[in-house]
Amino acid sequence: MKNIGILGASGSVGTQGLDIIRQYPDTYKLVSFSVGKNLELANKIIEEFRPDICCVQDKEDIDKIQSSSIKVVYGNDGLMEIAAYVKNDMLLNSIMGSIGLKPTVHAIKHGIDIALANKETLVVAGEIIMQLAREYNVNIIPVDSEHSAIFQCLNGEDHKHIEKLIITASGGSFRELSREALKDVTVQDALKHPNWSMGKKITIDSATMMNKGLEVIEARWLFDMPIDKIETLLHKQSIIHSMVEFNDTSVIAQLGTPDMRMPILYAFSYPDRLARKAERLNLAEVGQLDFKAMDFDRYRCLKLAYDAISIGGTMPVVMNAVNEVVVQQFLDGEIGFLDIETIIEREMNAHDVIQSPDLETILEIDAQYKSRKYEV
């Protein structure tokens, strides 16, 4: 039996993590979890899974947890307690935003393996996180379908034989639209992703291609690859999740249906694989797989992400923080879709980069840029 903790149990990845635990009751047990303000779901999780400890967002919410048999904690300190809970064998960090960074560090320092779905952890502090993981002999297993694919392709391979990583991208909600047409798209249009079921923020990031940019930065740290050896490729079916090309010109790809439960299960079960009852990939039904070179003029946020990691230091922190704020401003109807990339680029150009920042500097800059509201 493997004991699982989940940060962000009420989110898209978190609820799918619960599905996996539900499907394998003799293999996995939920022992700790956090939710934001979704107290109704928290009570259902407690009733079904009987965990030991739960974290809610605010102190006043503690009394709304109906079970007396569970320890209830709250806020950022509560997240830290969940992350390092002594019974955790693995922590699924699916909390959104840089608030997930400190709990990741805390879990690593307590020797707990990480199933990582929180992009910001590696985007803003990848070098620090991977160094800590090596120091504490902790496995970081990616849950993003693209990074899980690369991780699987690299099983048993020698790192020095890698020629390049190829990360696929669906193109998001607006892949069929011209750039001119993007000026007038609505929030409702943006939230209709053609392939994946995801939260609002990541769906917008997929439409701008910032999501793919964040994944490029994650891959740079997860797989210790120079940025010029990480490519992106448009693949609208989301069947090939990513590929690795080796120095002998061979290419290994990982394929599957667009279902996040697959990489979650792989992270939970690694280095084993568990049989799973789910829709299986039928390539005859798919019929064809389409590929297209990435257009950096069309997807400027992806270019900004390449620029940010090439510059390094605190630049990815600024890019990520501003993106988080302006995506919310777009969702709130305050700015247009193309304003997202314009504002991010402007703020990046104005930033004085600090190289080799420590964790506190990263968090200070992150908070500084997230405290602002951005005008067009």
From Swiss-Prot:
E.C. number: 1.1.1.267
Family classification: Belongs to the DXR family.
Binding site for 1-deoxy-D-xylulose 5-phosphate: 119, 145-146, 170, 193, 206, 211-212, 215
Enzyme class: oxidoreductase
Reactions listed under catalytic activity: 2-C-methyl-D-erythritol 4-phosphate + NADP(+) = 1-deoxy-D-xylulose 5-phosphate + NADPH + H(+)
Keywords in alphabetical order: Isoprene biosynthesis, Manganese, Metal-binding, NADP, Oxidoreductase
Positions bound to Mn(2+): 144, 146, 215
Task of the protein: Catalyzes the NADPH-dependent rearrangement and reduction of 1-deoxy-D-xylulose-5-phosphate (DXP) to 2-C-methyl-D-erythritol 4-phosphate (MEP).
Pathway the protein takes part in: Isoprenoid biosynthesis; isopentenyl diphosphate biosynthesis via DXP pathway; isopentenyl diphosphate from 1-deoxy-D-xylulose 5-phosphate: step 1/6
Protein name: 1-deoxy-D-xylulose 5-phosphate reductoisomerase
Cofactor names: Mg(2+); Mn(2+)
NCBIfam families on file: Dxr, PRK12464.1
Coiled-coil ranges from the UniProt annotation: none
A GO molecular function held by the record: NADPH binding
Binding site for NADPH: 10-13, 36-38, 118, 120, 199
Record GO biological process: isopentenyl diphosphate biosynthetic process, methylerythritol 4-phosphate pathway involved in terpenoid biosynthetic process
